[in-house]
Each structure stands twice: as C-alpha cells, then as structure tokens.
Amino acid sequence: MNKVLCFLCHKKTKPLSMMVDFFSKNRSNKIIIHVDSKSDINEFSCFSAYSNVILLSERHNVLWGGMGMVSATISLLKEALNHKFDYLFLLSGDDLVCVDERYLDDFLNNINLFNLIHYQDERNGYVNPDNRVKYRYPSFFFKKESNRLDYLRRLFFKLFKFSRINKEYHNFISSGHRFYKGSQWFGLNHKTVSDIILFLNENSWYLDLYRDSLIPDEVFFHTLIKYIGINDLYSDKTKVSDALRYTDWITGPDYPRSLDYDDVDKIKKSGCLFARKFKHDTSVHLFDELRKSV
C-alpha cells in the first residue's frame, strides 16, 4: 500500500526522527514534513538524506489557536497529491505508531480505506463549534500562555463580542448548514484528500469563513467533509477515538500528558494505530515495545 505520512512540527524530536526512519524504509511510503516558519529549517536538514522524505518549501507561521495550522495542513495535502498514494495520515512531531506496518496496511484494507477522523460525541466532552467561528477573534487570543493584560482583553472581548460578529458565519448557518468539531489528527483516503483540495481550489469563500476564527483546525476539515458529502467514515464506539489515536487528556499534569513506559500496555490494548504525545527524548526501546503484538 502506498501511504503518505504528513507531519506538522516546530522542532526536531526523537519521536519524529524514529518515525521518519521507520516509515522511510518502505519505499512505497512518502513522508512530507511542514516545519513552522519560526523554526530553523537547518535543524531538519538530516532528513534530506532520505529519498522519500520531503521538507515543504512553503512554510506557515503556526500560532496556537490560529489559522496557520489549517494553512499548513492544506499545504501538506496539496503536496501529497503530487505523489501516488492510497492513504494519508496527518501526524505531529510527537506521535508514534503503535502497530507494525503490516498490521497497519491490513487494517486499512479491512476497513476498505474508510476515513479515520473523529467527530466529538459521548466519548469526550462537548464543545460548541459555532463559538469558534461566530466571531472574528483579535490576535491576543492566539497565545498558548497568556499574561494578565491578555486576560483583561479577553474579558473586554466577551462583553463586546457582538461588535466582532463574523458575517460569513451567519451566511453559512442561514443556508441550512452547521459546523462540526473533532480531533485535528486524521487519516484520509486519496479520494477524500483530492475532493477536499478540489473544493478549496474552487471555493475561496470557505477559507474566508474561518478568517480570525479560534482553534479552527478542530472544525475546518470536519465541517468541510460533511459539507461536501463524504460519508465513508470509520466508526467504532468501543474505541477511544474514531481516528484511532491514543491521547491522555485526563491524568495530567500536562494536557495532553506526555506518555512513557507506564502507558505502553494501555496504548496497545486500546486498538489505536498512533499515540501522542511522547517526550522529545523517548527511547528506541519504548518505540519497539509499542509495536509488539498484545
């Protein structure tokens, strides 16, 4: 099976290096890496030695909660379509695959290459996606860590947010459409990737709809997929996520929690294909343990 592994990253981590080394051994795979424009691309020059690894020349400024993550993802999908593939995975630089590649390919064939994308449901807390797009958010929202002034600004925004209404949002809703939310990390078949890029190339209004929206990467593609009528979506309510990604948002102290040896058994028993996030110094031994059969 021809697969594309698309990575969004801002630093060269041990998990990223291990994933590139693992998947590049199969010459039918293509690995495409987007490096945040704020990062030093020279740190990633070692990946140029791999014949099936591409470092995107088109780089975006990825700010927490902003459209940069969506723009970077679109660039990855566009580059992927320049290559032959059956299936694509969107990953972070802190992800590790937790099955061997033969199992991965067999699983994808067994589900008829259905799309692995998670829409929020009873398995996770509900967040109203409309609030992400309904307003034009000022730049001080796009910070992962905020100071006292930012908190005051946000309070002021909540009091006067009616003045920042997104008119495109109301046009979309009044036409009978709705927004959907889920995890930004997904697996898509070739037809879905092609349909997404074709739609975006012909409908610039959809990008305008999300201008100055908040954390749009969890809404943009989920809503688009529903809007254009893609319905070959994998679903298994016995799994933690329909995207088959293992993430610990519960135990802390960081959210999501950095995974280690104590999580290996839980990850393997979850039935997930990938897990995140792993520490930057994660060992090869842990990676090997992850891919062993339960």
Residue ranges and their predicted role:
Residues 1-294:
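ER/Golgi luminal nucleotide-sugar-dependent glycosyltransferases, focusing on the catalytic module
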